[in-house]
Swiss-Prot record:
Protein name from the UniProt record: Ribose-phosphate pyrophosphokinase
GO biological process, alphabetically ordered: 5-phosphoribose 1-diphosphate biosynthetic process; purine nucleotide biosynthetic process; ribonucleoside monophosphate biosynthetic process
Positions that bind D-ribose 5-phosphate: 196, 220, 224-228
Biochemical pathway: Metabolic intermediate biosynthesis; 5-phospho-alpha-D-ribose 1-diphosphate biosynthesis; 5-phospho-alpha-D-ribose 1-diphosphate from D-ribose 5-phosphate (route I): step 1/1
């Protein structure tokens, strides 16, 4: 493997350490802190000239701070003559602001962030389960989008589910749910038809598919407040579902997520570590966190060796 160097911001230190361990290397020596007035300070304390550099940093909450850390780290490494810089962004914040709905006077912030990263000197982006895959087209540099499905699928198979049915929480998630159903021995598919009157508020309408007496697996890319998820689980149970498991790559968990999940009829919520869990969420017994370190470490190895990323998911 070429001379690679891994650096990490303050967003996901635990995940970064696990990735480094799997690649049998240490995280680079860098100090990412704050000046007394709150401005971000970055100091790279080792030689990176000509190196293949990977910066591991989710742009999760506090989103703006973590994004700015990433941008400033890229600039510091670029000015230190790094050979190639790959931004490893396990969770890409602002991804939900990817379009103008009905010509509303709103920004397409996902494009703004992509422009930031491209302009500051990122050579490549490696991310995980983008909210909308077309966001890759916002970048002027190559983007590799890896998936959490291998990690989540392993847990699904270990549960020995009873006549499982994969459930999409909305029409937009059908492609994702169908892909998981195919991997799960071509399991049946169900869809929850809902309407969202305002942000983070969802009204479940009806269920398309048979869930009576079956274990239901709700799959999504992220869980935010959990309101939509909890109402979906309630609707499934009302339609005779046996157990309800929710799988998502990104545990955003904002607002009343802890309260919503604790008081819900969901049997278990399984997520990954692309976003660290808050102390409050760590206390929620229904939440299980898996690690994406193996998938991301292998993706980094392949990028560094100029190998195919898509071959990781060609099963």
């Amino acid at each position: 493997m070429p001379d690679i160097k891994l650096f990490a911001g303050n967003a996901t230190p635990s995940l970064a350490k696990k990735i480094a361990d799997r690649l049998f290397c240490k995280l680079g020596d860098a100090v990412v802190g704050r000046f007394s007035d709150g401005e971000i300070s970055v100091q790279i304390n080792e030689n990176v000239r000509g190196a293949d550099v990977f910066i591991i940093q989710s742009t999760c909450a506090p989103t703006n701070d973590n994004l700015m850390e990433l941008i400033v780290m890229v600039d510091a490494l670029r000015r230190a003559s790094a050979g190639r810089i790959t931004a490893v962004i396990p969770y890409f914040g602002y991804a939900r602001q990817d379009r103008r709905v009905r010509s509303a006077r709103v920004p397409i912030t996902a494009k703004v962030v992509a422009d930031f990263l491209s302009s500051v000197g990122v050579d490549r982006v490696l991310t995980c389960d983008l909210h909308a895959e077309q966001i890759q087209g916002f970048f002027d540099v190559p983007v590799d989008n890896v998936f959490g499905s291998p990690v989540l699928l392993e847990d699904m198979l270990a549960k020995k589910l009873d006549n499982p049915v994969v459930v999409s929480p909305d029409i937009g998630g059908v492609v994702r749910a169908r892909a998981v159903a195919k991997l799960l021995d071509d399991s049946d598919l169900a869809i929850i038809d809902k309407r969202r009157p305002q942000a983070n508020v969802a009204q479940v309408m009806h269920i398309i598919g048979d869930v009576q007496g079956r274990d239901c697996i709700i799959v999504d890319d992220m869980i935010d407040t959990g309101g939509t998820l909890c109402k979906a689980a309630e609707a499934l149970k009302e339609h005779g579902a046996n157990r309800v498991f929710a799988y998502a790559t990104h545990p955003v968990f904002s607002g009343k997520a802890a309260e919503n999940i604790t008081n819900s009829v969901i049997d278990e919520v399984i997520v990954t570590d692309t976003v660290p869990l808050s102390p409050e969420m760590l206390k929620v017994a229904k939440v299980t966190q898996l690690t994406m370190s193996a998938v991301l470490a292998e993706a980094i190895r392949r990028v560094s060796n100029e190998e195919s990323i898509s071959a990781m998911f060609s099963h």
